[in-house]
């Protein structure tokens, strides 16, 4: 059985970080659906917060691989993944 899982992904980037469009493409390619996006800009840092939906088995509680991949991307300073609900 597959279920819908909601989560909040927060990425803090410096000036050399990827563009929002590139992040969105990575999330879409990983089969995550973005429901909402917010941005906090503070000087040279930007924090994007994405409310996402992932379809997965209830037994599969691991963090999606794309989250780890984004965390290794140059210019991304911090990553937070938190299930919602």
Which residues are covered by each model-predicted region?
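Short amphipathic alpha-helices in soluble, non-transmembrane regions
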Residues: 22-30, 61-74
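Canonical alpha-helical transmembrane segment with a positive-inside/aromatic-interface signature
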Residues: 1-39
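Non-transmembrane, membrane-adjacent beta-strand/coil modules in membrane-associated proteins
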Residues: 35-49
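Short, hydrophobic beta-strand segments
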Residues: 7-9, 46-54
């Amino acid at each position: 059985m597959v279920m819908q899982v909601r989560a909040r992904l927060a990425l803090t980037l410096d000036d050399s970080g990827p563009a929002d469009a590139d992040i969105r493409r990575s999330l879409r390619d990983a089969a995550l659906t973005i429901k909402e996006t917010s941005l906090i800009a503070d000087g040279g840092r930007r924090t994007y917060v994405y409310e996402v939906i992932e379809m997965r088995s209830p037994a599969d509680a691991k963090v999606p691989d794309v989250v780890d991949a984004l965390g290794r991307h140059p210019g991304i300073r911090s990553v937070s993944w938190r299930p919602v609900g």
